[in-house]
């Protein structure tokens, strides 16, 4: 997919997801245990919105799912395993730079006994340790 029609915005191997197009990527895989994983990507937010659009979602069923969404101008990382919430993090960092790209890395270990060890979020290489909500 190409951004806009302008070649200046054409970044090799990049994707642009426009909600009006209902575009998405999918991968069906049985690799791994689904309890420990990492997700890494570059993102550029195009504007402020009060909705909670999904950046990434994956689910086996309604009781086993993971999602990364926009929560107003923050990111939210959420995981439900066996019907129990294992991860729900909303870092305090706000995304208000609509011109720049941001690197995000999310790691999860839903088997960890201590809730603070279950998930970590890095934004532009900085571990996020201040949260508006962490549960």
Task: Place the predicted regions along the sequence by residue.
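Short, solvent-exposed beta-strand-to-loop segments that form ligand-recognition rims
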Residues: 116, 123-135
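Short, aromatic/His-centered strand-loop micro-motif at the edge of beta-sheets
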Residues: 78-103
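Short tryptophan-centered beta-strand motifs in secreted/extracellular beta-sheet-rich domains
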Residues: 41, 99-110, 121
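Extracellular glycan-recognition modules
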Residues: 20-83, 112-115
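Short hydrophobic/aromatic-rich beta-strand segments that constitute the beta-sheet cores
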Residues: 76-79, 121, 130
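Surface-exposed loop/edge segments in extracytoplasmic proteins
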Residues: 63-66, 84-89, 126-131
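Extracytoplasmic low-complexity segments
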Residues: 1-21, 32-34, 38-39
